Amino acid sequence: MRARAIRREPVRDRAQHFELGERGEALAIDQLERLGYHIVAANFSLPIGRNTRDAIVNAEIDVVAYDGPTLCFVEVKTRATAEFALPQTNVDLRKRRQIARAARGYRRMMGLAASPFRYDVVTVVAKPNDAHPRIELLKGFWTDEQLRKRNWQEQYWD
């Protein structure tokens, strides 16, 4: 059974960036499968807390897959052009923390807390009618250690 990005019915006057994002996710899944990843889930969403207005905050993991024995949480970033900024620049600290919290919840729900895991990013640069998009896999883009708060009680200035 192969997981696929959610395909929605065409909606009149739908923004192009939604279509580009969905196309990018589908291309990323195809690329990951070609590289030997076993896709487990696509567009996995989980509530991770509440904001200052007490509204529920959800985090989404674009792709959950296995690369051999390693569970991979993959964020897909799609752009029509990389002239202004690379797609991976939008995976900022806030986004990394959201994905890490959702990944922690996923691992807990599935009983995989002790399993090896990593965070990958797939970048897709594809114009709307481009037959040959540029797809790049960035393995181990960040770690949980990079998200931890620093312990300033140790002797910093010595």
Pin down the residues of each PLM region.
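Acidic-basic catalytic patches of nuclease active cores, encompassing PD-(D/E)XK
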Residues: M1-T52
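Glycine-rich, flexible loop segments associated with nucleotide phosphate handling
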Residues: N43-I48, R53-T70, H132-L138
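Catalytic cores of nucleic-acid endonucleases
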Residues: E19, T78-P128
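Short connector loops at helix/strand junctions that flank enzyme active sites
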Residues: R34, I56-E60, P69-L71, L86, ...
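Domain-level recognition of nuclease-like catalytic cores that cleave nucleotide substrates
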Residues: R108-D158
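Hydrophobic/aromatic beta-strand patches that form the interior of the parallel beta-sheet core
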Residues: V40, V74, D120-V122
